[in-house]
Amino acid sequence: MSVEFCDTNVVVYAYDTSASAKHVQARQLVERLWLEGTGALSVQVLQELFVTLTRKIPQPLTAPIARTIVADLATWHVVAPTPSDVLAAIDATVNWKLSFWDAMILVAAQRSGATLVWSEDLNAGQSFDTVTLRNPFADA
């Protein structure tokens, strides 16, 4: 069974009802990953998700509701960063010309065993070692 890693923006759209078409597409993707048991995230994604859902979307969720969402998603395969991951991300910022936080996402995805990363922010179709990026909103 292959693992698929989700970047924060995709998971946010799954719970942001004001995102219209992106909400529907992201929701379908997240639901499929739930049913298949193939979803992977990082601690960074869970942290960013909570902040975004409670502070940055047009209709912010309450902290208790966002906490429940984070707790539910924490049952997926979640990668916690290690010092080695930080060093690998630093190297990736140099080698791949990425921001540090994007590099941390890719390092976590690689460590999760994922070969596919769902993201709106990174370059769809681009590969980084064993991981390929895909934009769920560009495919529709």
Placement of each model-derived feature along the sequence:
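Amphipathic alpha-helical interaction segments
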Residues: 28, 44, 48, 68, ...
